[in-house]
Amino acid sequence: MTVVVDDHLLRDWLARRDPALLQAIDGEALATTNLWYARLCKSAARATGGALLAGWRRDERRALIASLVALPDDIVVIPMRQLAWKMGELVADHHGLSRLGAEAVASAIELNARLVVSARDDGPGIRQCCSTLGVDYGTLRR
């Protein structure tokens, strides 16, 4: 099975900083979304490291940036053009679901994957949508 992760978990996966995350993924294929990937890149590009990298040492940030510039081929990111229509349907049908959440749910559906997010990205819209559609959804505290 594949696991779709948010930007917080992608950051931690690439940095190999979190044994609990490694255990939660447990050898499964990894995927993320275009929007979460872009949000992590934006944070890494800021001189201060942005919200996702605040407090990281310069060498840690450089290593993460290198991984973001050349994202490993084994991390799946479905092209937006494959997801856009489904995202539109999801947002139209599920009150409170954001575009970030819609892309995550659409990706999980497309890949027949689990969706695991940082507790920071958990919200009632994405949680309820996954429950309604039978998408396996979970959170990890960071």
Describe every region a protein language model picked out:
Residues 44, 48-52, 72, 91, ...:
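Short amphipathic alpha-helical interaction patches enriched in hydrophobic/aromatic residues
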Residues 1-39, 43-60:
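Short, well-structured N-terminal submotif of metal-dependent ribonuclease cores
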Residues 13, 39, 86, 125-126:
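Phosphate- and divalent-cation-binding pockets in alpha/beta enzyme and binding domains
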Residues 7, 101-102:
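Conserved glycosyltransferase catalytic-site signature
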Residues 32-33, 37, 105, 109-142:
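Acidic, PIN/NYN-like endoribonuclease modules and their adjacent C-terminal/linker elements
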